[in-house]
Amino acid sequence: MFPMLTEFMNYGQQTVRAARYIGQGFMITLSHANRLPVTIQYPYEKLITSERFRGRIHFEFDKCIACEVCVRVCPIDLPVVDWKLETDIRKKRLLNYSIDFGICIFCGNCVEYCPTNCLSMTEEYELSTYDRHELNYNQIALGRLPMSIIDDYTIRTILNLPEIKT
């Protein structure tokens, strides 16, 4: 008779322990119910990127001296720099500069090590296309400045959202 009593006590303890675990999980769920949602309605609302966000690279053609430091520091040798040596002035003249963003890993080494600061990172991150060849940007496409999210009147940013009272 005593073994049956101890089994019943073990069953009761297990039931209490299971109820405690379920209660702990329920309390965690309830603690998250008061928080605001993290998701946003993406095409219509956008997050404002941080100051050091590494988005699309902006290139200033006039500042580039065709030193190819960006190619040497790139872990995948991505930037394509075409130049011609001007013999009369003994300097390189930049002919073409391009970056394929389908391959770029956005490490920022090219921007950091550029001696003339002709490269900079923008806050543009929407680079998706249906054709991967459209991701190969030449110096004209790299020279375009993106529209700032804050200046875009068609998009509600998180700063402009109405506050939800809790």
From Swiss-Prot:
Primary enzyme class: translocase
Binding site for [4Fe-4S] cluster 2: C74, C104, C107, C110
Cofactor(s) in the UniProt record: [4Fe-4S] cluster
Cofactor note: Binds 2 [4Fe-4S] clusters per subunit.
Gene3D superfamilies, per database record: 3.30.70.3270
Start and end residues of each 4Fe-4S ferredoxin-type domain: 55-84, 95-124
NCBIfam families: ndhI (TIGR00403), NuoI (TIGR01971), PRK05888.1-3 (NF004537)
Protein name: NAD(P)H-quinone oxidoreductase subunit I, chloroplastic
Organism of derivation: Bahiopsis tomentosa (Tecote)
Gene this protein is translated from: ndhI
